[in-house]
Amino acid sequence: MKTNVPAVRIVEVAFTGYPVTDIERAKAFYEGLLGLEVAVAFEHGGRHWIEYEIGGTTLAISNMSSEQWKASADGPVMSFEVENFEEAVEALRAGGVKFLVEPMATGVCSMAVVSDPDGNSVMIHRRNR
């Protein structure tokens, strides 16, 4: 990699995207269980793109996946800050969600990692205040 070239000037993170295979199943998880509200949605030829505005961040889910963009527990993790960690864990357990990392308390937060219906890792998080 060359080091004497102009730097890319990133101004913000536009969105984080998760590929999904079954859009209705994904919507049941993100909208029904997590309570996210759709900000933008479009469909073309049976392929969907849905965005959720969360604070100053956007999460996109899409079944417009390809060989290069597949669901994986090994990819990046979006961490959702929740109002009440214990209640969130109870709701996820009641919803039958698989926990990849069981709920734990650290010196700075409480957190757990769950799997969405396609196997993407999602963190539930609450900062100690």
Label each PLM-derived region with a short phrase.
Residues 20-23, 44:
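Conserved beta-strand-loop-alpha-helix junction that forms the acyl-donor binding cleft
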Residues 26-31, 92, 119:
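Conserved active-site tyrosine of GNAT-family acetyltransferases
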Residues 24-25, 87:
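Alpha-helical macromolecular-interaction surfaces
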Residues 1-15, 37-83, 87-117, 126-129:
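Vicinal oxygen chelate
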